[in-house]
Amino acid sequence: MHFTQQQLQRLMLHYAGKIAKDRKEQKIKLNYNEALAYICYELMELARKNLSVSELMSIGKTLLTSEDVIDGVASMLDEIQIELPFEDGTKLVTIHEPIANDDKIKAGEIFLSSEFIVLNENKTSIEIKVSNKGDRPIQVGSHFHFFEVNRFLSFDREKAYGKRLNIASGTSVRFEPGEEKTVSLIEFGGLKKVLGFNNLCDDFINDENKTKALSKAKEKGFL
């Protein structure tokens, strides 16, 4: 017995659809893959009986309801396309919105809080003036150790030891050439261990290591 790659794929889809059908008959709610396989399985069987494409498109919308699937699945299956063999050749059958979507849950839906989220609440902040003495823009990310930023940014680095920008995680502040602006800084949280960046610290944030970091910053031209 020899099968083409396409025939093997249909056999796999048929097998998956049969499993999904068994679970549906046991009143088990289908997940995304099971729902997709079940509808394709039924369409394959109906095509074998030589129903028309238009008939399959109509029937395809009646095979499952939102009660047959896990919450959120109906909104994920907005379209199904499958190539099926008919007596007069292979045809593409498209089912739009195969499951009536009356879900209480929609995949990817965003639920917004009615209350404002306070950024870095209860964190003590300081403000420092920073100027870009270089000839290129410099961008600093939210969690970059501000003490170790580009040496062309001029500010009181000692005050910035152990601190980062007081901005939302993943955002940044851009300093254009010659620009001066005031930024807000807060202390690092967690273990307060700073590694990497410009390798001025590479240790826990404390007074002893601060002295070492200042010395290294001076050696490397950051002060």
UniProtKB/Swiss-Prot annotation:
Keywords: Cytoplasm, Hydrolase. Pathway: Nitrogen metabolism; urea degradation; CO(2) and NH(3) from urea (urease route): step 1/1. One of its GO terms (cellular component) is urease complex. InterPro entries: Urease_beta-like, Urease_betasu_sf, Urease_gamma-beta_su, Urease_gamma/gamma-beta_su, Urease_gamma_sf, Urease_subunit. Its EC number is 3.5.1.5. It is found in: Cytoplasm. Residues 1-101 are annotated as: Urease gamma. It catalyses: urea + 2 H2O + H(+) = hydrogencarbonate + 2 NH4(+). In the N-terminal section; belongs to the urease gamma subunit family. In the C-terminal section; belongs to the urease beta subunit family. Heterohexamer of 3 UreA (alpha) and 3 UreB (beta) subunits. This is Urease subunit alpha. It comes from Campylobacter lari. The lineage of its organism: Bacteria, Pseudomonadati, Campylobacterota, Epsilonproteobacteria, Campylobacterales.
